[in-house]
Amino acid sequence: MRITIKNTVNGEVLSKEFIVKVQYDKTKPIVKLEKDQYGRAVFTIWQEKITTVSCHEYDPEKTSSRTIYTGTTTCDYHDAKHYSKKLGKQIAWLNCVNELLSNGVVTDEEADALDMIELDATAFELDMASKKLKKID
């Protein structure tokens, strides 16, 4: 996914472009043996999913040595009431935005706008001057 942030500084339009990738990895199977409310043995096997969102600033003039910022989360999809794939992806994205903010890549205002983006499109265009977010499918 591609995110473009357009910002106007002293009448000059500046833009930043980010490439965002989402990756899912599974942990080793988790085995749990417990007793239910009637005293019967219950044997359960499930896997947790690690969701990783990586983001780097796209600059065609800079072909090497890009800093990649990542956000990860581990979701226990065994408990489907509390975790979903979409929620795990959103938490990992927020962690990635926090890393971009803490490293000074984006401003507070840009980070607040990036928090609103859901990673379900091909591209987003964020215009900070007019405060508009445009989804491009």
Annotate each predicted stretch with a short phrase.
Residues R2-I5, L14-L33, D108:
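C-terminal binding/interaction regions
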Residues N10, L14, I19, Q23-D25, ...:
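Intrinsically disordered and other compositionally biased segments
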Residues E17, V22-Q23, E34-Q37, T73, ...:
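Generic hydrophobic, helix-prone segments enriched in Leu/Val/Ile
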Residues L33-K89, E99:
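Positively charged, aromatic-enriched nucleic acid-contacting surfaces
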Residues Q90-N103, T107:
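Short, compact, well-ordered microdomains
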Residues S102-D137:
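Intrinsically disordered, low-complexity charged/polar segments
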